[in-house]
Regions:
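RecA-like helicase/translocase P-loop NTPase motor core
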Residues: 1-2, 7-10, 24-52, 130-567
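Long, low-complexity, charged/polar intrinsically disordered accessory regions
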Residues: 1-137
């Protein structure tokens, strides 16, 4: 098919329709969407969601107004502000302010109800690190934000006391020491590392009100030795860090040492002293048997050197080790010992291979997708299915297995969602936009983005690939099961974290991929991937009732086999 420049508006959109619409026999057919004939090819493309404008968000809010309670609708509006860059957010508020404020309006009247709903939207933005000042088109509020329902001190004390009673003796020794240090600050040694082999602690995804390290300390996405925090000394973020007594960082061994060093410098600057980490109590948790930091095309020695153990601040840490596996039954102790030996390298032969027990190995003709999921799907045991996973070392193998599992589900309610793909930062060579065809962009599938075509069915297991709202439990790596499919929204149930069981609604957002192509690649799509199967790296920190591990191709990183077997 001939290429057409985007400057030839109608011809460009005609070409886009010819690539998308199946079975059309006339121009009228191409301009018909859901029974309505549009006046132009560009209008038909808009109706099909093939090109960008704010109508996507208006339609999503329209669908949401039928499904959601007002508070959920406000959360969706905040998510659109944060992740979708609407051109006219003030119009979106005006169009849906009645629906977003119904709960308040019943008690306070329409005008005051809308004011309170708007104030709570401001509070939600602040909780995500933004405010109305980041959206100058919106009416600005000075103070008077609606308070969120935070946990009380009494409730926190009750929860803490209950959890303390559940600790084993080794855990109590560590907790008592740290609590004592909190009451009697010793400026020389306030840093602790707790080594926890798989199953010896609590999964970090189960801990409430957590935040990512990058967001808490203002770390850049790409970390280097000379990177610095974005937090300003006089900012509210700095004041939050100043008032925090203890920082607990789980899965710390996965982070590059630069992250730990930046945090140390940032806390010293904020506390205005030269003490390690500004004198704060720092608790790192993790397991060096698991995955180490990722360095693209890095050698073995470069990856090891990137570990926090090789940082100049590691000397300030006192190490403890937990050994009792809290997840296994007494009859599984032998397997727990096998796991520990695998992680410690005891099982490796002279070629660094591990010989697995025969009872762990499937027959050569086995189909891993059917073995794990087929019976559960046929019996409609979707809750059990949600507690299973297939793990593989490579994204390509994961994608193939996910396609196989989706085939096992009922096809009657299947929907295919296509993305809108474009480029940015092409100003150095304006002609690039003339050369790049839409179908070329559609063919790109970087691992950091969802696919161009998302083929979904009810009861599909999916995983978020972006942090949408930590307060809602919508973090990168959160698994969900799809309940219902609409044109612009997905109704899902959360399967992991402290928000397990919550019903949430996902909309398309704008995602970016940088430093992979000669341009910034932009894709508007639901921020999810199928997750019947996932990479071993993505599974770290999660727990399943049943797993299958695809080892048709060898693992290639330190800790991958150990992580896979300890899920």
């Amino acid at each position: 098919m001939y290429s057409v420049s985007p400057t030839q508006t109608e011809l460009f959109h005609l070409r886009l329709l010819l690539l998308t619409v199946k079975g059309a026999t006339s121009f009228n057919d191409l301009r018909t969407v859901n029974g309505e004939v549009y006046q132009s090819f560009s209008a038909a493309c808009l109706a099909l969601g093939l090109i960008e404008n704010d109508d996507e968000w208006r339609r999503a809010m329209n669908e949401a107004a039928e499904w959601m309670m007002p508070r959920q609708l406000r959360r969706l509006f905040v998510r659109i502000l944060l992740h979708c860059q609407p051109l006219h957010p003030e119009e979106l508020w005006e169009n849906f302010k009645v629906a977003m404020s119904e709960d308040y309006s019943r008690h306070f009247g329409i005008l005051q109800g809308q004011q309170k709903a708007y104030a709570q939207i401001g509070t939600m933005l602040i909780a995500e690190g933004k405010s109305f000042t980041d959206f100058p088109q919106m009416e600005q509020l000075i103070g008077n934000y609606e308070e969120e329902n935070y946990i009380t001190l009494e409730d926190a004390m009750e929860i803490g006391t209950k959890q303390y009673k559940q600790l084993n003796n080794k855990q109590k020794v560590i907790v008592d020491l740290i609590l004592n240090r909190l009451d009697n600050i010793n400026h020389n040694s306030n840093c602790f590392y707790i080594d926890g082999p798989g199953g010896s602690g609590t999964a970090a995804t189960l801990l409430p009100a957590g935040k990512t390290v990058h967001k808490t300390f203002g770390l850049p996405v790409s970390l280097f030795a000379d990177s610095s925090s974005s937090i300003k000394i006089q900012s509210k973020e700095a004041q939050y860090l100043r008032e925090t007594d203890i920082f607990i960082w789980d899965e710390a061994p996965m982070a590059p040492r630069y992250a730990l060093e930046i945090i140390g410098r940032t806390l010293r600057d904020i506390m205005n002293n030269n003490l390690p980490f500004g004198g704060k109590i720092i608790i790192l948790g993790g397991d060096f048997r698991q995955l180490l930091p990722i360095k693209l095309h890095g050698t073995r020695s470069e990856i090891v050197n990137l570990s926090i153990k090789f940082s100049y601040v590691w000397k300030y840490f006192t190490s403890f080790s937990l050994s009792k596996n809290m997840r296994v039954l007494p009859e599984e102790n032998e397997f727990a010992k096998f796991l520990l030996n695998m992680g410690d390298g005891v099982l490796n032969d002279s070629n660094d291979n591990v010989h697995l027990p025969d009872n762990c190995i499937a027959s050569i003709n086995a189909n891993i997708a059917e073995d794990i999921y087929d019976e559960l799907i046929r019996n409609k045991e979707f809750n059990k299915m949600a507690k299973c996973a297939i793990l593989s070392a490579r994204n390509k193998d994961v994608d193939e297995i996910n396609i196989q599992v989706v085939e096992l589900l009922d096809t009657l309610e299947e929907r295919i969602y296509t993305s809108i793909d474009s480029t940015e930062n092409c100003s150095d060579n304006d002609e690039i936009n003339e050369v790049i065809l839409p179908e070329y962009l559609n063919s790109l599938s970087p691992s950091s983005l969802p696919p161009y075509k998302l083929r979904l069915k009810p009861n599909c297991i999916v995983m978020l690939i972006r942090n949408l709202s930590i307060n809602e439990g919508l973090c990168n790596g959160t698994r969900l099961i799809i309940i219902e499919l609409a044109d612009h929204l997905l109704k899902c149930k959360i399967l992991t974290g402290d928000k397990v069981g919550d019903i949430v609604f996902l909309n398309r957002i704008t995602l970016y991929c940088e430093n992979v192509y000669p341009f910034t690649f932009k894709r508007r799509q639901f921020p999810i991937k199928l997750a019947f199967a996932m990479t071993i790296n993505k599974s770290q920190g999660q727990t399943f009732d049943k797993i299958g591990i695809d080892l048709r191709k060898d693992v290639f990183n330190h800790g991958q086999l150990y992580v896979g077997f300890s899920r």
